[in-house]
Regions:
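Core segments of cupin and vicinal oxygen chelate
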Residues: 7, 14-59, 91, 98
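Core-facing hydrophobic residues within beta-strands of well-ordered domains
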Residues: 8-10, 79
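Basic/polar N-terminal segments that are highly enriched at the extreme N-terminus
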Residues: 1-6
């Protein structure tokens, strides 16, 4: 380990997405995050979109990477989850389910 980590902070986690519009809808309209920035990279044929609850200078954010074309991604076994703190998990799950979001393992139920 580096001897001085007091200035370290988590910047972002990156997820590859097939449908950027659907992913942005989920993170912004369902989870209430803000689209912080979005950039196309034509020479690399990909788009990066960053979403989060605060600015990137002080908060960790989610980077959504959309590779152009018909890329299929396998569900990896190493990725576990994103943890988001909410005031009432049961109410939040109910609200998300009412919006058509599939809750694979409802909290405490």
């Amino acid at each position: 380990m580096t001897s001085n980590t007091d200035k370290f902070r988590l910047l972002h986690t990156m997820l590859r997405v097939r449908n950027l519009d659907a992913s942005l809808d989920f993170y912004t309209n369902k989870l209430g995050m803000k689209l912080l920035r979005k950039n196309d990279y034509p020479s690399g044929e990909f788009t990066l979109a960053f979403v989060g609850y605060g600015d990137e200078e002080s908060e960790a954010v989610v980077e959504l990477t959309h590779n152009w074309g018909d890329n299929e991604y396998e569900l990896g076994t190493a990725y576990g989850h994103l943890a988001i703190a909410v005031p009432d998990i049961y109410k939040t799950c109910d609200e998300l389910a009412a919006q058509g979001v599939r809750i694979p393992r409802p909290a405490g139920r």
